[in-house]
Amino acid sequence: MITELHGIDIRENEPLKHYTYTKVGGPADFLAFPRNHYELSRIVAYANKENMPWLVLGNASNLIVRDGGIRGFVIMFDKLNAVHLNGYTLEAEAGANLIETTKIAKFHSLTGFEFACGIPGSIGGAVFMNAGAYGGEISHIFLSAKVLTSSGEIKTISARDMAFGYRHSAIQETGDIVISAKFALKPGNYDTISQEMNRLNHLRQLKQPLEFPSCGSVFKRPPGHFAGQLIMEANLKGHRIGGVEVSEKHAGFMINVVDGTAKDYEDLIAYVIETVENHSGVRLEPEVRIIGENL
C-alpha cells in the first residue's frame, strides 16, 4: 500500500495476462486505475519523485507484455472513458473503448468513424498507433489531443504536430501519453452508417480469428505486398511454437491456442520474419509493440 496514493485503485504484483488481448504477460509491480486526471497526475508525480518507471497500457490490444512483467507503475485508463459530443466534434478520453465510441457516433448519425467499428482497443491506443482498417485511419478525422508529458505536464497537440504516418504518430518518439482526443465527424444517415458498419464487421468475422486471444495484426503492410499473403506463401499457416500459432484463418494473425506465453509469441514472430525473408526477400516489420522484461 502506497500511503501517498491513498484512495486510488492500485494493485501490487498484478499479473498483466488478465488484462491483455493476448492473455500473456507477467506481473506489474503496481497496476493503477486512475478515475480522473487528478489521480493520474498524482500517480505520475509520485513515480517521478521516487524515480520509478511508469507507462500506460491503454486497452493492451496491439501489444505483447513479456513474461517477466513490468517494473514500476503500469497505468490503465479503463476508468477514464468519457465520450462527449459538441456539434460534429466528438471528444473521447483515452480509455474509451474504440468500438463503443464508433457506436456513439452512429447513434448520433455522425459519419467518419465507420472504419474503426471492429478495431479492438482504446482511443488513446488508436491515436498512438494511427489505427486504421478498410481504407480509413485515425488521422483522417483527428483534430487534436491532450497529452501527458513524461514530466507530468498536460498540453495540447494538433494534427500537424502529431505527424501521422502508416501506424505511426509523433508521440511514439516523444513518449507523450494521450489522455483525450477530439475528432471531426460529419452529419450522415443513420441507416447508411449502420449498414456500412455491419458490412465491415461481417468482413472481419469472415477473415479474422476473433474466437482466439491475439494481438491483432502482427506485421505492418510491406510496400507492394500484404503480410498475410507473404506468410501464407511461405507455408506458415498453422505453424506453432509452444501455445501460439499462425492463424489458419488469416496468416497475418498469431493466436494463443493453448497456454501460450510471450516468449512463444516472440519466437514465432522471429521465425516468421526469417522464413518470409528467405522465401520472398521481403523483411516484415512488426506492428505489434513488445514491452516488459523476460523471465
Swiss-Prot record:
<comment type="similarity">
    <text>Belongs to the MurB family.</text>
</comment>
<feature type="active site" description="Proton donor">
    <location>
        <position position="217"/>
    </location>
</feature>
<keyword id="KW-0133">Cell shape</keyword>
<dbReference type="InterPro" id="IPR016169">
    <property type="entry name" value="FAD-bd_PCMH_sub2"/>
</dbReference>
<dbReference type="InterPro" id="IPR003170">
    <property type="entry name" value="MurB"/>
</dbReference>
<keyword id="KW-0961">Cell wall biogenesis/degradation</keyword>
<feature type="active site">
    <location>
        <position position="167"/>
    </location>
</feature>
<dbReference type="GO" id="GO:0008360">
    <property type="term" value="P:regulation of cell shape"/>
</dbReference>
<dbReference type="InterPro" id="IPR016167">
    <property type="entry name" value="FAD-bd_PCMH_sub1"/>
</dbReference>
<dbReference type="GO" id="GO:0071555">
    <property type="term" value="P:cell wall organization"/>
</dbReference>
<dbReference type="Pfam" id="PF01565">
    <property type="entry name" value="FAD_binding_4"/>
</dbReference>
<dbReference type="Pfam" id="PF02873">
    <property type="entry name" value="MurB_C"/>
</dbReference>
<dbReference type="GO" id="GO:0008762">
    <property type="term" value="F:UDP-N-acetylmuramate dehydrogenase activity"/>
</dbReference>
<keyword id="KW-0274">FAD</keyword>
<dbReference type="InterPro" id="IPR011601">
    <property type="entry name" value="MurB_C"/>
</dbReference>
<dbReference type="GO" id="GO:0051301">
    <property type="term" value="P:cell division"/>
</dbReference>
<dbReference type="GO" id="GO:0009252">
    <property type="term" value="P:peptidoglycan biosynthetic process"/>
</dbReference>
<dbReference type="GO" id="GO:0071949">
    <property type="term" value="F:FAD binding"/>
</dbReference>
<dbReference type="GO" id="GO:0005829">
    <property type="term" value="C:cytosol"/>
</dbReference>
<comment type="pathway">
    <text>Cell wall biogenesis; peptidoglycan biosynthesis.</text>
</comment>
<dbReference type="InterPro" id="IPR036635">
    <property type="entry name" value="MurB_C_sf"/>
</dbReference>
<protein>
    <recommendedName>
        <fullName>UDP-N-acetylenolpyruvoylglucosamine reductase</fullName>
        <ecNumber>1.3.1.98</ecNumber>
    </recommendedName>
</protein>
<feature type="active site">
    <location>
        <position position="287"/>
    </location>
</feature>
<keyword id="KW-0521">NADP</keyword>
<keyword id="KW-0560">Oxidoreductase</keyword>
<keyword id="KW-0285">Flavoprotein</keyword>
<keyword id="KW-0132">Cell division</keyword>
<comment type="function">
    <text>Cell wall formation.</text>
</comment>
<dbReference type="InterPro" id="IPR016166">
    <property type="entry name" value="FAD-bd_PCMH"/>
</dbReference>
<keyword id="KW-0963">Cytoplasm</keyword>
<dbReference type="InterPro" id="IPR006094">
    <property type="entry name" value="Oxid_FAD_bind_N"/>
</dbReference>
<dbReference type="InterPro" id="IPR036318">
    <property type="entry name" value="FAD-bd_PCMH-like_sf"/>
</dbReference>
<keyword id="KW-0573">Peptidoglycan synthesis</keyword>
<feature type="domain" description="FAD-binding PCMH-type">
    <location>
        <begin position="23"/>
        <end position="188"/>
    </location>
</feature>
<keyword id="KW-0131">Cell cycle</keyword>
